[in-house]
Amino acid sequence: MENLEALTEEAIELVNCANDLAALDTVRVNYLGKKGPLTALRKTLGKLSAEERPVVGAKINEAVARVQEQLNQKKAALELAAINTKLASETIDVTLEGRRNEVGGLHPVTRTLDRIERIFSNVGYKVEQGPEIEDNYHNFDALNIPAHHPARAMHDTFYVDEDRVLRTHTSPVQVRTMENQQPPIYIICPGRVYRCDSDQTHTPMFHQVEGLVVDKNVSFADLKGTIVDFLRVFFEKDDLEVRFRPSFFPFTEPSAEFDIQWASSKTGWLEVGGCGMVHPNVLRASGVDPEVYTGFAFGLGVERLAMLRYGVNDLRLFFENDLDFLKQF
């Protein structure tokens, strides 16, 4: 029995020294397995007398139970330690800054369009849209552009078929609006337009904003005031100088082009658009009596305004999809 006590203490000490589950299982097999010394002691019970057998058997069972209990406790401790180690290695440090998602920006032409629309909407203008594929009537005839006018030539205009074109301006939207609405009319018509032209300052497709006012007693002074106020707000310069030069457009009479004072220009002035009083023939073609109503119209190149506002020298940069360029905005 002295051997039993020594074996028990030895087994318990080895259990306590086990550093992992594999080492712990080795101790279990070595002491409680089929060939283990504690198991072997049970096999000697048959050699004892009937009186000794229950006493010795009880002590052996007690020793085995002590070792087994120690094994269970150690196993639970090792399993808990393994779980904690795994959790520690897989934990997420919520104090770290998260990954930032890059936020895209609006295209400079879109920014410019939005800015123009916002300025005019703030003073009561409505935004009107129209088809980009137009018939000859709305793109030319209703705007007092005669059949022999060079703008109708194929080298200036994209023809879809004999009677339909990719609109060369947004003026057809003005005609359609006058056909469907009674004055007073205060609108702007932003959109894409198309012309056979491509160089540093021209592209086959570009954006235009045209404005139209039709009401009683509208004068050229109203037109000038509208354009000057718009340009000063757009460029955020209250002292911006604007000049008007006589010009010719089939759909307006009188007609003018307007420039702004610009230091980097060779002449000190830059053209930014055209304008004029709506021609009586255009009013009549749209069902508006020119004896009762007058109106003015103007047109602005959106890319030109964007180039000036953002300091871009080549119009084509807006449409080349160069991310290094576009990320500046």
Curated annotation (Swiss-Prot):
Database matches in InterPro entries: aa-tRNA-synth_II, aa-tRNA-synth_II/BPL/LPL, Phe-tRNA-synth_IIc_asu, Phe-tRNA_ligase_II_N, Phe_tRNA_ligase_alpha1_bac, Phenylalanyl-tRNA_Synthase, tRNA-bd_arm
EC nos: 6.1.1.20
Primary location: cytoplasm
Localization per Swiss-Prot or TrEMBL: Cytoplasm
Catalytic activity: tRNA(Phe) + L-phenylalanine + ATP = L-phenylalanyl-tRNA(Phe) + AMP + diphosphate + H(+)
Gene Ontology molecular function terms on file: ATP binding; magnesium ion binding; phenylalanine-tRNA ligase activity; tRNA binding
GO BP annotations listed: phenylalanyl-tRNA aminoacylation
Entry-linked CDD domains: PheRS_alpha_core
GO CC aspect terms: cytoplasm
Positions bound to Mg(2+): E253
Cofactors (names): Mg(2+)
Similarity annotation: Belongs to the class-II aminoacyl-tRNA synthetase family. Phe-tRNA synthetase alpha subunit type 1 subfamily.
Subunit structure, as described in the record: Tetramer of two alpha and two beta subunits.
Protein name: Phenylalanine--tRNA ligase alpha subunit
Organism this protein belongs to: Teredinibacter turnerae (strain ATCC 39867 / T7901)
Organism taxonomic ancestry: Bacteria, Pseudomonadati, Pseudomonadota, Gammaproteobacteria, Cellvibrionales
